Regions:
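Hydrophobic/aromatic beta-strand patches that form the interior of the parallel beta-sheet core
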Residues: 22, 40, 63-65, 90, ...
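FAD-site-proximal beta/loop scaffold in flavoenzymes
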Residues: 4, 9, 14-33, 131-166
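A Rossmann-like FAD-binding core segment of flavoenzymes
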Residues: 56-156
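N-terminal Rossmann-fold NAD(P) dinucleotide-binding loop
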Residues: 48-49
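Short coil/turn connectors at secondary-structure junctions
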Residues: 18, 35-38, 58-60, 85, ...
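Glycine-rich Rossmann-fold phosphate-binding loop(s) that bind the pyrophosphate
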Residues: 43-45
Length: 166
């Protein structure tokens, strides 16, 4: 069944998907609309760090927006990101809106510091959301045991909680 990208849950995110909002830097990062432009990556894990590092090949600057005050990524990945001259971490911050739906393209993000409440706008041409995945297991709820995140619980030999279902 696979998994789907976790979304920010913003109306502007949905409206601007494929118009500057994307979930895959390696798929879309080299597109002309992103070249030599400021870009935003949302997230703080290994995937977000990989996306940010990849995008430094194309973007003028990459803002790494993370809701915490340090990365959750592995130490080696975090060190690479924090040393890179084209990556600017934006700590303790969440995206509250992606701009600009009226122009039908991404022109920036409105962000809010979760500690101070201060808001500001970061100008950018693209938003790369890298905040994890959600398993596509909705159809199995109530039929097969799922963990707290919605993943199928496996027993020995890849068996599930239902005999004969692997």
């Amino acid at each position: 069944t696979g998994a789907s990208h976790r979304h920010l849950g913003l109306e502007s995110e949905r409206k601007l998907e494929t118009k500057g909002v994307t979930y895959c830097a390696t798929c879309d990062g080299a597109l002309p609309i992103f070249r030599h432009q400021p870009l935003v990556v949302v997230g703080g894990g290994d995937s977000a760090c990989e996306e940010a590092l990849f995008l430094t090949r194309f973007g003028a600057v990459v803002y790494l927006v993370h809701r915490r005050d340090q990365l959750r990524a592995s130490k080696i990945m975090a060190d690479r990101v924090l040393r890179h001259p084209k990556i600017q971490p934006v700590w303790d911050t969440v995206v509250t809106e992606i701009l600009d739906v009226r122009q039908d393209k991404v022109t920036g993000v409105r962000v809010k510091n979760v500690k101070t409440g201060a808001e500001r706008i970061i100008d950018c041409a693209g938003v790369f959301v890298a905040i994890g995945h959600v398993p596509n297991t909705e159809i199995f709820k109530g039929q097969i045991e799922l963990d707290e995140q919605g993943y199928i619980v496996r027993r020995s030999g890849a068996a599930t909680s239902v005999p004969g279902v692997f």
